[in-house]
Amino acid sequence: TYPEIWLQERFLDLHNVFLSFEGSMYISICLGLIDNTTGVLYYVNAEHPWTVLYRDGKASFLEQELSLRKIGTPDQEDQLYIRIFNLMPGDVIITGSDGRDDLVLRNQDGVEFIQEDEQQFLMRVEEGDGKLSRIAQRVKETGALMDDFSLLRISFDESLTETELPKEIPDQV
C-alpha cells in the first residue's frame, strides 16, 4: 500500500467514527507519515494548529491556509488531499495544541489580554533552537498558559547529509 493511500484510509476511518456522533463531537488532527529513507512527509491537517518546520535556525509554517475542517464535519470527504513535503537532513517538525498560541499577557497598563497571534509561536521555536524543553520554557516566559499545552517534535535524520538522499522525490500525489 502506498503511504498516501494508507493515510487517506485511516483519516476516513476516523472521520466516519466522528460522523456517527451526528455533530455532537469533532476533533482537530494532524496525522502524518515520514519515509525514513527519502525524508518525504505525507500528512493531513484538519483544523489543527499549523505544523512548524524548523530548518537552519528558522521556523515557518508548512500550511498557508485552512483546507480541511475538523474530523466529523459533514460533506468534506471530497476535499481531503494528502499534503507532501520533502524533509531535508536536520529538519525538525513541531506540532502541538492551540495552548501554544493562547497566552495571557499584560499590556503596559497592566491590563490582561489574550495573545492569539500564531506567528509568535514561530519566534518561540527559533528562540528555543527547535528543542521542546527550551520552546516550552520560552512560551511560559512569554505569558501565562490558559489552555492545554502539548508539543510534539519529529526530526528527520539529523546525521544525514543532503548527498545521501535519493534524487527523485515526488512533489505531490
Where in this protein do the model-derived segments appear?
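Acidic loop->beta-strand submotif enriched in PP2C/PPM serine/threonine phosphatases
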Residues: 27-29, 64-106, 144-145
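Short beta-strand-to-coil "C-cap" segments at the C-terminal boundary of structured domains/repeats
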Residues: 153-160
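Histidine- and acidic-residue-rich, metal-dependent catalytic cores
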Residues: 13-14, 48, 71, 118-123
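Active-site-proximal, acidic helix/loop segment immediately C-terminal to a metal-coordinating Asp/Glu
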Residues: 1-2, 87, 91-143, 160-170
